[in-house]
Amino acid sequence: MKKVAVMNDLSGFGKCSLTAAIPVLSALGIQCCPLPSAVLTGQTGYKYYHSKDLSDMIPLYTDAWRKNNVHFDGIYSGFMTGPEQINHFLDFIDTFYKDDTFLLTDPIMGDDGETYSIYSQNLLESMRILSAKADLITPNLTEACLLTGDSFQQVTGYSDRDSLVKATSEIGQKLREQSGKNQDVVITGVKCKNDSKPYIYNIAITEKGIFTNKSHFFDVSFSGTGDLFASVVCGCRINGVSTEDSIKLASSFLYHSIADTMKDDTQPEDAVNFEKFLIELIK
């Protein structure tokens, strides 16, 4: 069975990060090997939560797995607590990333033009190094702008879809050039304020060109949707599916999950009802 090492946090509530990646990758026929960056009583959208940083454990995971001669078909990183942890993870990559390993990085730093509480200039510099090593990255538009130094306000100031897609694609091309390799960049959750209908776009910039996927926009920000998207894309790519088709499946899976969740009074921090739709991922 194919194996993926997933570096992300483990939250007791919120169905995000590792609790999103494990079922999704399992449904795709891949063993998820958790590498927890932190443990939380619940994701940070809850009013009350406690957390513990597990940075000191990362070298121990690296050491034990190396001694056990583990091989990974994929490595996938999400939430990181800071630059020190990223540096530990870079050592992990140096140990386990081989010619036949697929590396996906979701450079979690912010959203909607705002940075998260973990953000710092040192985190950004470390995230740039990590992102450049990846075969595929899935930043949202805020994170993509942070990585390139572009203005989020300027990019989102375009009123028409074509100009917004063009500007976003140019940022994606900059990220590909920064990586110095044949990297696929998928910029997620792009919204055009003047669309006649509420759509959200995922824009892929690859060697083949630009691919734009649109899906219905739900005006609620549920926990874990980015983790679900990245997990589907990661698993599909490891299974040999193209980036474009991986995005299509991830978007469809998310649409059905969110639409079902909108039927009840689920709070955004409680995440989406994705479990019943895992069947869509099983082939």
What are the functions of these language-model segments?
Residues 244-283:
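Charged C-terminal helix
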Residues 12, 210-224:
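Short pre-catalytic strand/loop immediately N-terminal to key active-site residues, enriched for Gly-Thr
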Residues 118-210, 241:
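Conserved phosphate/ATP/ADP-binding segment of small-molecule kinases
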Residues 1-105, 109-117, 275-282:
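Conserved N-terminal subdomain of the carbohydrate kinase-like
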Residues 60, 129, 170, 245-253:
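A non-catalytic, amphipathic alpha-helix used as a structural packing/dimerization or gating element
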Residues 146, 220-243, 247:
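Short, small-residue alpha-helix embedded
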